[in-house]
């Protein structure tokens, strides 16, 4: 049984978001003994219990208040919200933050030998999908009538099997579509993982834990998006060097021993440092340029 004073968080047991969700909690310093054969895993160092379930069960568990938090793809979340609206069921929740993984898109695709010139090319055809509500919402806005073929898996084989004329499915790289003789023609919905909470009263103790967890999650994501930069630069080019590096704060500038014309500069850059930027830094006279990953960060 769950202890009512502990935070309950629903996570995908296996699949696309499972390992990234576990990695996120681990990076936040939460020690959870995760065993895939178990439904519930308990944190050793924080009052947090993880419920390991199917991804399409997570929105309902949060909306119904069975768990306090959930990590789920926005595509699954929105599909369940639309489904519940159609059934006049409880569908409220709060998005605490979007996460930096599970990035994909829900797209329409047709066989490569099919003529497609405009969204109107999809009128009155049969479309296979696992996301009927998202598909209907999108095509209704375009005033496109269609026939839906609901499939819970292997959607990409539907045209070859004669079940549908087109599909609406998740796409990451497009390799699966290509392997099945399909081409992407229209993006329906863009998605990534998000952290959600139930929409209702949460006691003070739980709020404190959730706030602490949120601070850590934001710190982990910020660290992933940032790099620690160290370099030597000419004093007379310092402002030009700084202008190339986008940071939350001004850099630390230190004197170099035995060199009055150059300084050492340290800063956290909030953007990915590309080779082109490094080449521009070098052209300004910067040297000993080091770009280091950041494990944890708190502003």
From Swiss-Prot:
Enzyme class, UniProt record, top EC level? transferase
- Compartments in which it is found: Cytoplasm
Q: Which reaction does it catalyse?
A: 1-(5-phospho-beta-D-ribosyl)-ATP + diphosphate = 5-phospho-alpha-D-ribose 1-diphosphate + ATP
Read off the lineage from the record: Bacteria, Pseudomonadati, Pseudomonadota, Gammaproteobacteria, Enterobacterales
Originating gene = hisG
Instruction: Provide the E.C. number(s) assigned to this enzyme.
Output: 2.4.2.17
Describe its assembly: Equilibrium between an active dimeric form, an inactive hexameric form and higher aggregates. Interconversion between the various forms is largely reversible and is influenced by the natural substrates and inhibitors of the enzyme.
Going by the UniProt record, its keywords in alphabetical order are: Amino-acid biosynthesis, ATP-binding, Cytoplasm, Glycosyltransferase, Histidine biosynthesis, Magnesium, Metal-binding, Nucleotide-binding, Transferase
Specify where it is mainly localized. Answer: cytoplasm
Q: Is Cytoplasm set as a keyword in this record? A: yes
Q: Name one GO biological process term.
A: L-histidine biosynthetic process
Q: Which GO terms describe its cellular component?
A: cytoplasm
Q: In which pathway does it act?
A: Amino-acid biosynthesis; L-histidine biosynthesis; L-histidine from 5-phospho-alpha-D-ribose 1-diphosphate: step 1/9
Entry's PANTHER family?
A: ATP PHOSPHORIBOSYLTRANSFERASE, ATP PHOSPHORIBOSYLTRANSFERASE ATP-PRTASE
Q: What does UniProt list under activity regulation?
A: Feedback inhibited by histidine.
| Free-text function comment from the UniProt entry | Catalyzes the condensation of ATP and 5-phosphoribose 1-diphosphate to form N'-(5'-phosphoribosyl)-ATP (PR-ATP). Has a crucial role in the pathway because the rate of histidine biosynthesis seems to be controlled primarily by regulation of HisG enzymatic activity.
**SUPFAM superfamilies tied to this protein:** GlnB-like, Periplasmic binding protein-like II
Its family remark reads: Belongs to the ATP phosphoribosyltransferase family. Long subfamily.
Name the record gives this protein: ATP phosphoribosyltransferase
Cofactor(s) for this protein? Mg(2+)
User: What GO molecular functions are on record for this protein?
Assistant: ATP binding; ATP phosphoribosyltransferase activity; magnesium ion binding
